[in-house]
Amino acid sequence: MKLILLYLAVVLCFVGKARSFRNGAGFYTSLGGQMRVFDFNKKTLDAKSSGGSKDYNLSDGGKSNSRKNLSPATGGSATQQSNLDDSHAPNLGKSETMLSLLGYLGAFRPVLSGLTSLPRVGGGAHGNIGLRAEISRNGVNLSGDSSARGSLNVNPLSGLSTKSGNDATVQGQQAAASGGSKHNVENSSLSTGSATSNKGADKPSEHLSNLFLKGLKGIVEPITSAAGGSVSSAVENLKAQIKKFIEPLTEDHGPTSTSASVSGDSSTSSRLDGHSSDGLSKVSGDDPTVQGHDVAASDGSKQNVEDSTLSTGSATSNEGDDKSSDNSSNTFREDLEKILEQITSAPGGSVSSAVENLKAQIKKFIEPLTEDHGPTSTSASVSGDSSTSSRLDGHSSDGLSKVSGDDPTVQGHDVAASDGSKQNVEDSTLSTGSATSNEGDDKSSDNSSNTFREDLEKILEQITSAPGGSVSTVNNPDEDRLISIIENLAGHIQQSVTEASQSAERPNAQSSNNLSGKLEPKYENPTNGSSSASSADKPYEEGMRKLLKFLEEQYGQTGTDASVSGMSSESSRSNVHLSDGFSMESGDDATVQGQQAAASGGPKQNVESSNSSTGSATSNGGGDSNEVRGPSSSAVDSTDSGDRGNLADKQGPGFNGPEGVGENNGGSFRAGSLDTGSKSDSGSHNLSSGSGSRSNVSTGGEPSDKNEPADPGVSGRVTCPTGKTQSGSPSVA
């Protein structure tokens, strides 16, 4: 008699591993479990144990051998890996976490051998979740992976096996189903920043200081030589006051510089990949006396979504306040006229009031010139890049296959159907802009204030140490015309002051104006010795006007530069591929009719849009030039061709290629250009589809030259029973 024994075994295994590596540590764990149930028909027991698993075999003398088991199994694993690395400059740390889950349900059969067995079922599931984080000096990078896969196998087997050999009377059926999906999500963020700012206050240029010193020399020289050494105290006071004024000006208003830089890069990337596959397969293989049916179905889809954003910015701005602005020359002219007027109208023999007025006027002239028109420089830069990219890829495939292969005495049908869809959507936006503004005329050097101070001290030293009206000159070879005018003016002033101090009793002195610049002042009151000269009687006024005009021309140059440039680009791309196919194939013996049909169709569209705009503007001010440049672009092209049907009959403009040559028409498209001038917006819009393929389909034994409509952008391959093969490939411009 049969001995029925029920045995239940459960094995639980936990494994933990720890490992160390360079500058990091890792930990790995896994958990697994297994359970099996066996039925055996033998009095003797043979058991084996190896590596945590147990196996039991049953034998019944060789007459009958049956094995029934229930084998469910589950397993899981989780890993954690951390890496803190300081030795490498780019990476500060890295952490990775991975979690895997595995489940499996093993095949099982009933424990009673005398009864009809239940279907054997098997299945498995696997999941994987991963998260990675990386911290570096440039930012944080996060990425993750997630995948899951499952399968289920069902084998309904009803069979009675004996030694009598009647296998042909037993039907067999088998079905298998599987499905899987995969997802990948990745997100990356990168941020980088720096800042730059430049500020500086320049000092008067050497050229301006020379002009000012020459004019000051021509004014002070006659005062010193007018009354011998009687004005030494006033000159000393003037020297001390000017030094006292210039020293804090050099120290406090010296060149300063502050530097900082700001630039930003921001990148965000998101990607999603999805893959789904479902398949059902049913296979039946029997003897020739039994009909057989085979059905296979598969479904697959794949999706890819990618989103990327990139942003980069920088800014630049340069602004400078000109020392040679328009109102500065006016201030210089007005103050110089006041100084000369006071010197001219000074009472004879006493120039102390004139010196005091000169000191006040010089201070009044220099202070607004330095404070209001002092050189300042502020620098900043702005430029921006913005890029956004989005991509979506979708792939879907559905297929149904039915295969039957029997003997010649049985009809067979073979049907295959497939459906495929692929989508690619890509959106890209790129924006780039830059702006630059430069204002201010830089006529200053670093050592200009030192040169100004040294030259002024030399002049004052000569004024103080001059013996009784003789003052040595400071050689300035430049500006010969200015020197001659100043010397002429100084001669007029010296002659006027000397004659006013020595000849107070001259009653009526008429003034004359000649080319040599001789001055005979007219005194209204000879008793008090006061002198006055009207504007019409001043013989040196013309020379002074020439001096002021020359100084204004040299001193009043202004310049303003402004430049703005920008570029904006935006592109959008969409790719859609759809393929629907139905294939019916029957291949039997010669006694059975065979039919074959193949149909395939798929539109493919490629839409690309690009918009680009570039502009620049430049402005230069200061009385010289003003220039503005507008955007200029070219290349505007739009083509559209490639309709459904025979490409030999429908060819769009710009299509090059042989017509009706062979079984495949290929072509390309010419790109045109259009120059719209100096001010235009440019863009290109291309909508094109490539070449199609022709296929010959035949039934029976003779080939057919039937031309089926082929969709553009679709390639196919059809094999006919006669052995003739046609192929085609897509070509997209």
Curated annotation (Swiss-Prot):
Keywords: Glycoprotein, Secreted, Signal. N-glycosylated. GO terms for cellular component: extracellular region. Residues 48-91, 172-204, 249-330, 369-450, 496-733 are annotated as: Disordered. The keyword Signal applies. Transmembrane segments: none annotated. Residues 1-20 form the signal peptide. Glycans are attached at residues 57, 141, 187, 327, 447, 514, 528, 611, 686, 696. Residues 62-84, 186-199, 300-318, 420-438, 496-516, 525-535, 722-733 have a biased composition (Polar residues). Residues 654-665 have a biased composition (Gly residues). Detected in terminal tubule cells of the submandibular gland (at protein level). Expressed in submandibular salivary glands of 3-day-old males but not adults. Expression in adult submandibular glands is restricted to females. Isoform 5 is expressed in both 3-day-old and adult sublingual glands. Disulfide bonds: none annotated. This is Submandibular gland protein C. The gene is Muc19.
